[in-house]
Amino acid sequence: VEYFVSYYDYYQPEAYVPKTDTYIEKDSAINEQIDRMRNAATRNILEDNDVIIVASVSCIYGLGDVESYSQMTIPLKVGDEISPREVHRRLAELQYERNQQNFVRSTFRVQGDILDIFPAHYEDRAWRISFFGDEIESISEFDSLTGKKTADLKEVTVYPANHYVTPRPALSQAIVHIK
């Protein structure tokens, strides 16, 4: 069972009060736990897992194009030839933040040939990708708090850090049409 409900702890829409000529700016606060649950629900649907989604009215608002979102994933498999720098670049495109100090959801860190990724859909688990040159040598899952390895994996798919990512070609095309 997954949840796809409104992720706002607080939401103040923008408003204008003509009587006092006052503009009230939009303000909001996003609940990190609910955001993680929304990402987990999206991942489970796209991976065709048997899943029940409990949703609120917020699910009727568009998340964008499914094909575009799916294009933005990064499949990683043991034995794949891909440069670590390319993976770092792709993670940044997926709105993951490189952070060596504060390893939290939707971040990654690099130590030599080791890349740690804290997926947007996990609460307490992360992935360690070990490279030998430009080849993925191993992938493991570990507890993000203790660092203890919990599983050896053959492959993983990294999903975007949030639902509002756009592939570069679509972004370039939109810019041309706006001009």
For each of these PLM feature ranges, what is it?
Residues 1-179:
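ASCE RecA-like P-loop NTPase motor cores
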